[in-house]
Amino acid sequence: GNHATHNIRKEDEIIKVENDAVSSLEAAFAIIAAMSLGGVRKLEIEIGESAMVMGQGILGLFATQFCRLNGAYPVIAVDLNADRRNLALELGADYALDPRDADFPVKVKELTRGKGVSACVEVTGVSAALNQALECAAYMGRISLLGCTRVSDTVIDYYRQVHRPGIRLIGAHNFVRPKFESYPHHWTNRDDCLAILDLIAAKRILVSPIITKIASPAEAPALYKSLCEDEDFPIGVVFDWKKL
């Protein structure tokens, strides 16, 4: 956001939280959860299709829950961190795998009757993870590129991994969405946020387990420093502005 004490926003950019069942701390995650939901929508998941989410940070944990809500089975969560894998299981993943395992692609195939995953959300933005996603994809599978893969430091065999098996790579940047009217698989940011608030109120998606620290805004400098330097930085940190 801006380095300012006040922001002037357009009226249609403001979303009022009208349901008392949604706390202000939970509502704070609606915008980032909408990024995940947009990436999952573009996969057009059908009931019973397998799905995999590469990376279980905040975006990945929401994507995992949305894959499950879309009727995907099994939902496979992937992360290097054991705590994040366990949290993904708590939030509804059917399996959680470590991508460093030598037989990682084999395990994915075993969990999907030898086919590979039909739908995958790549959240990490690491090109090596995209390469692994391609190795695990089913024939004519889809991969949603939710993470920003800015550095192409891994060789991808586009004929063998993309062209020949008919894989669809889908750009899922949050800005690539309709501005005024939603349509199937492509909702406006506002409509996605409203849907997420409804799902939080109905306990269809869970936010509280993702919140690992509630901090005063006065702690911001130290927290941002830790974010840059600490590999084990908490997943979900929320500023409680009432603590000022």
Functional labels for PLM-detected ranges:
Residues 2-5, 79-87, 154-157:
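Short, glycine/polar-rich helix-capping loops at beta-to-alpha or helix-loop-helix junctions
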Residues 19-20, 25-102, 106:
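Mid-domain Rossmann-like dinucleotide-binding core that forms the NAD(H)/NADP(H) cofactor-binding site
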Residues 12-25, 115:
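Glycine/charged-rich beta-loop-alpha catalytic/anionic-binding loops adjacent to active sites
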Residues 75-79, 145, 172:
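Short beta-strand "acidic-cap" motif of Rossmann-like dinucleotide-binding folds
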Residues 114, 144, 151, 155, ...:
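C-terminal capping/lid region of NAD(P)-dependent oxidoreductase domains
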Residues 109-110, 157-211, 222:
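C-terminal substrate-binding/catalytic core of Rossmann-like NAD(P)-dependent dehydrogenases/reductases
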Residues 1-15:
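Glycine-rich phosphate/adenylate-binding loop and adjacent beta-alpha elements
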Residues 43-45, 91-170:
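Glycine-rich cofactor phosphate-binding loops and adjacent beta1-alpha1 units
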